[in-house]
Amino acid sequence: MHNYLDFEKPISDLEGKIIELKKLASEDESIDTTDEIGRLEVRVREAIVEIYSKLNAWQKTQVARHPQRPHFVDYAKTLFQEFTPLAGDRKFSEDAAIQAGLARFRGQPVAVIGQEKGNDTKSRLKHNFGSPRPEGYRKAIRILEMADRFGLPVISLVDTAGAYPGVGAEERGQAEAIARSTEMCLGVKVPLVSVVIGEGGSGGAIAIATGNRVYMLEHSIYSVISPEGAASILWRDSTRAREAATNMKITAEDLKSLGVIDGIISEPLGGAHRDPDSVIAATGDVIANALGEMASRSGEQLRNERRQKFLNMGRNL
């Protein structure tokens, strides 16, 4: 059962008719609805093509947040073998918003870091809706240090609206944890590939996304603040989020043209939530190619190239 976004109403109406016809045919075998269903399926595809070929920034934001969009756990199950999650920051507690550990990726030992939002009420509460606390970033630092020590490539999958802004998180050094994680990403002497698979929100995202290669899924977003947050600050009106999204340049196309990311991973027709397996496979191929390109580079080269990449970004924007 699909959760339809508001701009998907034409698709919803057509697929609703298909469901009704299938139900009618199952109740009365004398009724043949095959031809009509076939025609409607063609119209559904045409509607999806028409709508998704001209999504605006706000609509892409909605797709990036779609509740059925594949999350970190979905990628981990498919892309990684022998994934062994590590827990805790060795200072305060465990933070389930960041999942991190060791695994094999197509036979190669790697370190994995990702943000998990959860997919139902219970798991969303467990993972704090994908908004990490300081302990999550300090756990990421543990994994990065381990990867650097043992020469393991790092793969990070980004999907967060932003770091958790609660009082407790601030008291325990949220800003410092984000800064240290960013610094560690920039400093490791191993390949680091980052992919924004949904939302890339502010420092909460960049803390694990300062990679040698940074990619975005076609309908993901990456920004310093959410459109709602920007609208609240600029106009004191969060309902102007659509306007803010347009002006913030948050889409994959915008960020590729600005040189912030290295590439865009195409999504299936209608978004990643309509065919999770294919987008996960495509993401795996891109990661594998990136790691292959960097395999012959020394640790110093990898670190210097990564640092220079982000220094240039600040100079040239």
Swiss-Prot record:
It is an enzyme of class 2 (transferase). Disulfide bonds: none annotated. GO terms for cellular component: acetyl-CoA carboxylase complex. GO terms for biological process: fatty acid biosynthetic process; malonyl-CoA biosynthetic process. PROSITE patterns: COA_CT_CTER (PS50989). One of its GO terms (molecular function) is carboxyl- or carbamoyltransferase activity. It is found in: Cytoplasm. The keyword Lipid biosynthesis applies. Its main location: cytoplasm. It catalyses: N(6)-carboxybiotinyl-L-lysyl-[protein] + acetyl-CoA = N(6)-biotinyl-L-lysyl-[protein] + malonyl-CoA. NCBIfam families: accA, AccA_sub, PRK05724.1. Component of the acetyl coenzyme A carboxylase (ACC) complex. First, biotin carboxylase catalyzes the carboxylation of biotin on its carrier protein (BCCP) and then the CO(2) group is transferred by the carboxyltransferase to acetyl-CoA to form malonyl-CoA. Belongs to the AccA family. Acetyl-CoA carboxylase is a heterohexamer composed of biotin carboxyl carrier protein (AccB), biotin carboxylase (AccC) and two subunits each of ACCase subunit alpha (AccA) and ACCase subunit beta (AccD). This is Acetyl-coenzyme A carboxylase carboxyl transferase subunit alpha. The lineage of its organism: Bacteria, Pseudomonadati, Pseudomonadota, Alphaproteobacteria, Hyphomicrobiales.
